Structure formats: structure tokens, C-alpha cells
Amino acid sequence: MRGIIKGVSNDGLGVLGEVLVPFAYPGDVVEVISTRERFGRTIARDFKLVKSSPIRVPGKCRYFGRCGGCLWQGLKYREQLKLKEEIFKRVTGVEAEIKGSPRIWFFRNISNFIVTVNGIGFKEFGMPRTVVSVDECPVFSERTKLYIRAMKRFLRETGLNPWNWKNGDVHYLQVREGKFTGEVMINVIAHIPPSGREELTEAFGFADSVYWSLKRDKRDDPKGIPTLIKGNEFIRESIEGLVYLIHPSTFFQTNSYALPILLKAVESFAEGSKVLDLYSGVGTFSLYLAKKGFEVTGVEVNEESVRVAKKSAEVNSLDVSFIPGRAEDAKLKGYETLIVDPPRKGLKDFSKRIAKEGPENLIYVSCNPSKFVLDYRNYLSKAYKIEDAVLIDMFPHTPHVEAVVKLRRR
């Protein structure tokens, strides 16, 4: 099957009739050699690029086209931004201007390298049990080779076994960087208690913080119970004059360079003086708004995130109230602005209560537009209307985008 890619799917695959083609862009002429069925869709397994689209550029990474991390790396950056606007409008019906990332290379502050018998790296696109072994990653860090080399040294000196998809000792190497502080956190995620402490601290002697996280299940994700092996409990990131503390058990926005744009977008949509920040995490929005003079209450179910948020407030000498608990149980009365930044699944039924009890001004932050629009159409639209929206490209070279939507009571 040969033809011209006419557009992209909502998840960023090139569209050729009924076939979806990864790493293909509008204007490309491709020949599909073989396909596979996945979740009711036909996806090209093997294809040839017959003629390049004028919006195509060479990938910067030598693993591009195999590694599943950067689907759009072969697309001019301004075209990436245009497509993200188009997809958002197609999914939500809302027109929103996108703000690009100040940096599109070496911008990620976290990377999870899977450690396997077949190498250390990332999963191949569409092949969850095939690993692309890497020694560089131009969207993460210029020091990737250093991190991979240190991990290999540690495995070699201890004789610990990498993951083989059924069992093994070490499963993931998670690395976090403070892009504006230069600090580094290493987190080895393993199926055994801390082992080879001396070898670990020597191999990663350059790190400011070294953790070992015990993984008690065999799910293929970088999660475990962390134990500090060496160095500082936290690393720091500096954003807009604020110090954010980062811990292995907590989430932090992955693009430190675009984060100020996201923070300013939320601030520009906030009204009044009293703000309720639900799903507040480590206080990303709460701390920034408090610095800007708002009276902020953050609610977060992850108690470790609450602990880190409180410590960050102390470090920054800010008066912010962080409450541990489910966002769904929070009291919504008495605030002029409500911020919600739910997980990818969205608000679901909680949006019904927000529609009934929420304040005049609602700010919905979402990395999953399809879930936002469900929440809006099912419940929020009965009480709120969309007043403004902006997109922030926190994820260059991928189809993903962060949306900030301002809603006002009807």
C-alpha cells in the first residue's frame, strides 16, 4: 500500500487511509509493507519512506525511529506546534494558542532507563518487550552517557542481574536533574533490598543524592519504596526565584524550561485573593501563587508530596496551607478561584460536585484533552462556560501538550 500521509491521528500517528503510520507526517509519501492490529486499529509495522514531506527534518537522535519516546522528532518544530493546536481543537472544539518550549533539546529533568538483559535504554515503539539500548538522549541530558556507564559499572562490579521480563534484581535506573541548579538524583529501582552500597556510591560518586527503591511487584513501571543510600534527601530545582524540592516519591513537571510559562498562564487566569489548588502535588502552582500574593490552600492525597510541599514552603519562607487528603473530599466553598490539575483519567464524577459547589472562577490544567472535554461536556458545562485557554508545549517532539483552560460560572 502506497500513498500520501494526509494528517495525523489524535495520538500523533500518520494517517494513510485506514492505516496509522508511526514516525510519518503530513506530506510524506510512504509504502506500507506490513501491518498489525492493536486495540481495534491497523498500525504499520514496517514501511518505507518513498518521498519526504517538506515539513520533515532529520532526527537529532540516532535512535529516532526505533525508540518510542520521540514520535515527532523528525518534524519541524513550528509544525509540531501547529499540529498540537489542530489536535486540541479537534478533540475539544476549543481554539487555543500554543506557547512553545524555550528549549527543545536537553529539556527533560527526568528519565527512566529500563535495565534489561538486552541493554539499558528505552522501549521500542509498539514493542513493549524490545529495548533500544542507548548511550545518549538529546531530549534528556548531555550527561546520559555518564549515567549509563555508571549503571553498567555497578552491575559489573556487583554481579546483580538485570530484568529479563520475568525476574531479575535491577529493573530501572531513574535519573533526575535540577536543570537550573546542576544537582543530580540517582534512583536504582530493584526487586531486592539495597545491595552493593559501596559499589553504588562509587559508581555514582558524582550524584548529589543516591536512592535505592525496593519494587515489590513485577509491573513494568519505575516505582518502588525509596531508601536514601548517599547524599541529600532532596535535590533542588530553581524556577522563577523559587526553590522546589524533588524527592523520588513525588511528581514534578518534566520540562523545567517551559514550567515558568505554565506557571504564568495559571497566574494570569487566577482571580480574587483566595485560591484552592486541588491535586496540588509538591506545590508547583501553590508556591508560585503564594509568592505572587495569593492566599493559597493546596490539597493532595499523596502524603509524601504534602511533606515535600511543606518543606519547600519553609525553604522559600512562604505561608501556604497544604492539606493531605483526597481532592474529591475537599471543601469548595470560600474561594474565589479553584485550580484542578487531575491525573490523566480526569475528574470524572467529581466534576459534578464542582459544577454544583465550585467558585466563580475555575482553572482546569490538563495533559489529556480528551478527558478534559469529557469532564466539561458531562458536568462542568452545565455550570461553567469556557472563557479562555492556552496550550504550553511541555513535551517537544511528542504529540502531547499541556492545556490551561479558564472557566467562569454561567
Swiss-Prot record:
Task: Please name the GO terms that the record assigns under molecular function.
Answer: 4 iron, 4 sulfur cluster binding; metal ion binding; rRNA (uridine-C5-)-methyltransferase activity
User: Tell me, what does this protein do in biology?
Assistant: Catalyzes the formation of 5-methyl-uridine at position equivalent to 747 (m5U747) in 23S rRNA (m5U859 in the P.abyssi numbering).
Q: What is the lineage of its organism?
A: Archaea, Methanobacteriati, Methanobacteriota, Thermococci, Thermococcales
User: What family name appears in the similarity comment?
Assistant: Belongs to the class I-like SAM-binding methyltransferase superfamily. RNA M5U methyltransferase family.
Question: Which GO terms are recorded in the biological process aspect for this UniProt protein?
Answer: rRNA methylation
Q: Which SUPFAM superfamilies match?
A: S-adenosyl-L-methionine-dependent methyltransferases
What this protein catalyses is: uridine(747) in 23S rRNA + S-adenosyl-L-methionine = 5-methyluridine(747) in 23S rRNA + S-adenosyl-L-homocysteine + H(+)
Q: Which organism is it from?
A: Pyrococcus abyssi (strain GE5 / Orsay)
Q: Does the keyword rRNA processing apply?
A: yes
- Known activity regulation? Activated by magnesium ions.
The entry marks the following residues as binding [4Fe-4S] cluster, namely: 61, 67, 70, 137
- Read off the InterPro entries from this record: MeTrfase_TrmA_AS, MeTrfase_TrmA_CS, NA-bd_OB-fold, RUMT_ARLMC_TRAM_dom, SAM-dependent_MTases_sf, TehB-like_dom, U5_MeTrfase_fam
Q: What is its EC number?
A: 2.1.1.189
Q: Where is the active site?
A: 367 (nucleophile)
- Write down the PROSITE patterns for this protein, in alphabetical order: SAM_MT_RNA_M5U, TRMA_1, TRMA_2
4Fe-4S is among the record's keywords: yes
Listed Gene3D superfamilies: 2.40.50.1070, Nucleic acid-binding proteins, Vaccinia Virus protein VP39
Q: Which residues bind S-adenosyl-L-methionine?
A: 253, 279, 300, 341
* Record key words, sorted: 4Fe-4S, Iron, Iron-sulfur, Metal-binding, Methyltransferase, rRNA processing, S-adenosyl-L-methionine, Transferase
- What this protein is called in its record is 23S rRNA (uracil(747)-C(5))-methyltransferase
PANTHER family recorded for this chain?
Answer: RNA M5U METHYLTRANSFERASE, TRNA (URACIL(54)-C(5))-METHYLTRANSFERASE
Pfam families annotated for this entry? PabTrmU54_TRAM_dom, TehB, tRNA_U5-meth_tr
